[in-house]
Regions:
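Conserved AAA+ ATPase "SRH/arginine-finger" region at the nucleotide-binding site
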Residues: 204, 216-229, 242-250
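Short, glycine/polar-rich helix-capping loops at beta-to-alpha or helix-loop-helix junctions
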Residues: 200-208
Length: 272
């Protein structure tokens, strides 16, 4: 992209002359290419990493609420020390959604200056493990990714179910993924946002003191009925357009009451 942009800016180049001949708005083309390259790094070529900034760029629905938690995450990420975030909450409370909302805010420059050029990548541990056959292969792949990340100041890595890092790849004679990660976090070579449930945090994460002290905790409580109602009000238009129907506020309130009565093993806002 950078090479293409440089060629297009050179008004005496053949490329510029050809595009002018076909009445292409070169300035608009340069703008679009610059916008696209703003969300890209060499990490886009790695299949186990997903560029969340790019993923949410064309998302049609908005993510509502959690302003206090987002502010807390931004404050932690902007700190000089202990600037890694660990989001704790039950399944369905919106841990991944809050990271997507942060990426949306970065895209629209709605964050503090220190976060304005950041790109968030999700590291898929399952994809990383799936391609391994031999002992030590997982650790080798994991370390290669981390080595590439540490050279990029504008990258934040998001690891969902981060408790799986503790013990991942660990076998007799092998080191687990958390032991690879710890030195990089200690030297502040990279920034990580992790997400896990409350049970898994106490079961795995809290016991690993060296790993635990590298992170600042952000707890995501289950949304109340009132908060869930506001979320549903904000997103109902997308369902109305898709199904060609109208959903009244009365129906939304009834829906929340019904799921509260009949669905006990899930949490708001996911179950609504």
């Amino acid at each position: 992209n950078l090479l293409t942009i440089s060629l297009l800016k050179e008004k005496e180049s053949v490329a510029y002359e050809i595009l002018q001949k076909y009445h292409v708005d070169v300035e608009e083309l340069i703008y679009l290419l610059q916008e696209k390259s703003a969300f890209e790094t060499p990490l886009d070529q790695i299949s186990t990493l997903v560029n969340i900034n790019k993923k949410v760029k064309n998302k049609k629905y908005k993510i509502i609420g959690r302003e206090n938690e987002i502010e807390q995450i931004c404050t932690i990420l902007s700190k000089k020390e202990k600037n890694n975030v660990l989001i704790i909450g039950e399944a369905g409370v919106g841990k991944s959604a809050i990271v997507e909302k942060l990426a949306m805010m970065i895209n629209h420059h709605q964050v503090v200056d220190s976060l304005k050029n950041k790109i968030i990548y999700e590291l898929s541990l399952s994809s990383l493990v799936a391609g391994t056959k031999y002992r030590g292969e997982f650790e080798e792949k994991f370390k290669k990714i981390i080595d590439k990340v540490k050279n990029l100041d504008n990258v934040i890595i998001f690891i969902d179910e981060i408790h799986n890092v503790i013990g991942a790849g660990g076998a007799e004679g092998a080191i687990d993924a958390s032991n690879i990660l710890k030195p990089y976090l200690a030297r502040k070579d990279m920034t990580v946002i992790g997400a896990t449930t409350i049970d898994e945090y106490y079961k795995h994460f809290e016991k690993d003191h060296a790993m635990n002290r590298r992170f600042s905790l952000v707890t995501l409580k289950e949304n109340t009925k009132e908060e869930t109602f506001e979320i549903l009000k904000g997103i109902k238009c997308y369902y109305e357009n898709f199904h060609h129907i109208k959903i009244s506020d009365t129906i939304l309130k009834e829906l929340i009451n019904l799921v509260d009565q009949h669905i006990k093993n899930r949490t708001y806002p996911d179950k609504a």
